[in-house]
């Protein structure tokens, strides 16, 4: 269940930012700043995709969990049983 719930957003966002970074430059009109606009589109797509990917991967496998005292753990265990 976890693999499917994680794979779908990754595929959707990869496709979305891939289209912006790859297909977006084809729609930039010709002009003196065309190269700058294409560079901005590709750089924006790469940066936004990397930001999203790092954020989603950090939530998927956190480095540390919540820090609870022993009394809190025993209390929660008592209430949930």
UniProtKB/Swiss-Prot annotation:
Residues 29-35 are cytoplasmic. One of its GO terms (molecular function) is proton-transporting ATPase activity, rotational mechanism. Pfam families: ATP_synt_H. Keywords: Cytoplasmic vesicle, Glycoprotein, Hydrogen ion transport, Ion transport, Membrane, Synapse, Transmembrane, Transmembrane helix, Transport. InterPro entries: ATPase_V0-cplx_e1/e2_su, ATPase_V0-cplx_e1/e2_su_met. One of its GO terms (cellular component) is clathrin-coated vesicle membrane. Its main location: membrane. It is a multi-pass membrane protein. It is found in: Membrane; Cytoplasmic vesicle, Clathrin-coated vesicle membrane; Cytoplasmic vesicle, Secretory vesicle, Synaptic vesicle membrane. GO terms for biological process: pH reduction; proton transmembrane transport; transmembrane transport. Expressed in brain (at protein level). The chain crosses the membrane at residues 8-28, 36-56. Residues 1-7, 57-81 are lumenal. Glycans are attached at residue 70. V-ATPase is a heteromultimeric enzyme made up of two complexes: the ATP-hydrolytic V1 complex and the proton translocation V0 complex. The V1 complex consists of three catalytic AB heterodimers that form a heterohexamer, three peripheral stalks each consisting of EG heterodimers, one central rotor including subunits D and F, and the regulatory subunits C and H. The proton translocation complex V0 consists of the proton transport subunit a, a ring of proteolipid subunits c9c'', rotary subunit d, subunits e and f, and the accessory subunits ATP6AP1/Ac45 and ATP6AP2/PRR. Subunit of the V0 complex of vacuolar(H+)-ATPase (V-ATPase), a multisubunit enzyme composed of a peripheral complex (V1) that hydrolyzes ATP and a membrane integral complex (V0) that translocates protons. V-ATPase is responsible for acidifying and maintaining the pH of intracellular compartments and in some cell types, is targeted to the plasma membrane, where it is responsible for acidifying the extracellular environment. Belongs to the V-ATPase e1/e2 subunit family. PANTHER family: V-TYPE PROTON ATPASE SUBUNIT E 2 (PTHR12263:SF2), VACUOLAR ATP SYNTHASE SUBUNIT H (PTHR12263). This is V-type proton ATPase subunit e 2. It comes from Bos taurus. The lineage of its organism: Eukaryota, Metazoa, Chordata, Craniata, Vertebrata. The gene is ATP6V0E2.
């Amino acid at each position: 269940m976890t693999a499917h719930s994680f794979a779908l957003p990754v595929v959707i966002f990869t496709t979305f930012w891939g289209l912006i970074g790859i297909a977006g430059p084809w729609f930039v009109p010709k002009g003196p700043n065309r190269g700058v606009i294409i560079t901005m589109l590709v750089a924006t797509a790469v940066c936004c995709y990397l930001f999203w990917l790092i954020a989603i991967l950090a939530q998927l496998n956190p480095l540390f969990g919540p820090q609870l005292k022993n009394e809190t753990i025993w209390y929660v265990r008592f209430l949930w049983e």
